[in-house]
Amino acid sequence: MEGWRGAWYVPCLASHETLQELCRKENLRCKSIGITNKSLKSYEVEYLCDYKVEEGKEYYLVKWKGWPESSNTWEPQKNLKCPKLLENFLSDKDEYLSRMKEGRALKVRNSVKALKPAVADYIVKKAKQRIALQRWKEELNRKKNHKGMILVENTVDLEGPPIDFYYINEYKPAPGINVINGITTGCECSDCPAEKCCPKEAGFILAYNKQKKLKIQPGLPIYECNSFCRCGPDCPNRIVQKGTQYSLCIFRTNNGRGWGVKTLQKIKTNSFVMEYVGEVITSEEAERRGQFYDNQGNTYLFDLDYDSDEFTVDAARYGNVSHFVNHSCDPNLQVFNVFIDNLDLRLPRIALFSTRTIKAGEELTFDYQMKGSIDLTSDSADGLSSSRKRIRTVCKCGAVCCRGYLN
């Protein structure tokens, strides 16, 4: 599958452990899979796999970093210098016992002489998940081009990073779709906003107040200053283009809604939070994909119908943090169309702004059908394609005003 800007995404068929073993045999270094000069010459504990007591001594089965599982060894507890990994081991063990209702969570030491295979298996899976999520977090933060950090958290189940999802920062046009930035001129303002600033030239008012917070009603478009404008980066009409300013966390929900997104910082009312990006496809292609997504119960198609219903944004495989934002019938985010370097009315950028003050630790949500505060008769993004939905999806948002279904 062709990637972004001509790159190619080719899935690796070999496991992480197999690649490590091959690198060792060929004496190759590969930092991304933990094979470095240091790991080739020394042993570092990656995680603990099992526990036993022999002749009164405690032993832990150690998975060595950069070495295949076939090289695991039993090591006495006194030799281990990894308190955090030991803490993870004990915590995962207690968590499993508690969930399985095998009695109260017991302390390993002085309690048992060996773990049951099911317990050890869970501990290994949890350790592998923790490593996979850490790698995913690092990958997301390498690829994102905005200020805010992205964290990843799963304290609910053993689900790891999504398969076949590629992080992008802007629209990815599907083959045959040309997104041309037609801007050749910009405003001459030295102190925006002025009489002939970008929004006024387009026939609209400036979207932001002096505090750089949104002041327009849902349904109205946002026209920001562009790359040809005379004003500098501190211009109050450059907000969405600066990207997400908040640190966010992709987390596993505990009520069957899969992944979600929460903010790690307080967000004030009418603040820009993030863009909704994905693959830009035709409405015909969206119709075809929609049938497949219906059967899966997923909703990633966002119609762009500000001027026409020609294009749709599909964030199923290509997207950013917004891919993981859940629906709510009482959301704290609102969708707005934004035009910056591309004034093609068929291809507005989709920005999510806060509708109220959002506390640190609170989940971010938007209404997939955008009912409520938005004027549905106005020219606005149409939301995650309701017209294509043939199979009704039960809503689990839990809001008092919940409509019962996502579509």
Swiss-Prot record:
Domain SET span(s) in chain numbering: 246-369
Domain of life, source organism: Eukaryota
Residue numbers binding Zn(2+) 4: 329, 395, 397, 402
Sites where the protein binds Zn(2+) 3: 192, 225, 231, 235
Keyword Nucleotide-binding: no
Limits of the Post-SET domain: 391-407
Cellular location(s): Nucleus; Chromosome, Centromere
InterPro entries the record matches: Chromo-like_dom_sf, Chromo/chromo_shadow_dom, Chromo_domain, Chromodomain_CS, H3-K9_MeTrfase_SUV39H1/2-like, H3K9_Histone-Lys_N-MTase, Post-SET_dom, Pre-SET_dom
Binding site for S-adenosyl-L-methionine: 257-259, 300, 326-327
Transmembrane segments: none
Domain Pre-SET: 185-243
Assigned EC number: 2.1.1.355
Boundaries of every Chromo domain copy: 43-101
Name of a matching Pfam family: Chromo
Primary residence: nucleus
UniProt: Zn(2+) 2 binding residues: 187, 198, 225, 229
CDD domains (UniProt xref): CD_SUV39H1_like, SET_SUV39H2
Catalytic activity: L-lysyl(9)-[histone H3] + 3 S-adenosyl-L-methionine = N(6),N(6),N(6)-trimethyl-L-lysyl(9)-[histone H3] + 3 S-adenosyl-L-homocysteine + 3 H(+)
Single GO MF annotation: histone H3K9 methyltransferase activity
Keyword list, A-Z: Cell cycle, Centromere, Chromatin regulator, Chromosome, Differentiation, Metal-binding, Methyltransferase, Nucleus, Repressor, S-adenosyl-L-methionine, Transcription, Transcription regulation, Transferase, Zinc
One example of a Gene Ontology biological process annotation: methylation
Protein's job: Histone methyltransferase that specifically trimethylates 'Lys-9' of histone H3 using monomethylated H3 'Lys-9' as substrate. H3 'Lys-9' trimethylation represents a specific tag for epigenetic transcriptional repression by recruiting HP1 (CBX1, CBX3 and/or CBX5) proteins to methylated histones. Mainly functions in heterochromatin regions, thereby playing a central role in the establishment of constitutive heterochromatin at pericentric and telomere regions. H3 'Lys-9' trimethylation is also required to direct DNA methylation at pericentric repeats.
Family: Belongs to the class V-like SAM-binding methyltransferase superfamily. Histone-lysine methyltransferase family. Suvar3-9 subfamily.
Record remark: domains: Although the SET domain contains the active site of enzymatic activity, both pre-SET and post-SET domains are required for methyltransferase activity. The SET domain also participates in stable binding to heterochromatin. In the pre-SET domain, Cys residues bind 3 zinc ions that are arranged in a triangular cluster; some of these Cys residues contribute to the binding of two zinc ions within the cluster.
Protein name: Histone-lysine N-methyltransferase SUV39H2
Species the sequence originates in: Gallus gallus (Chicken)
Gene name of this polypeptide: SUV39H2
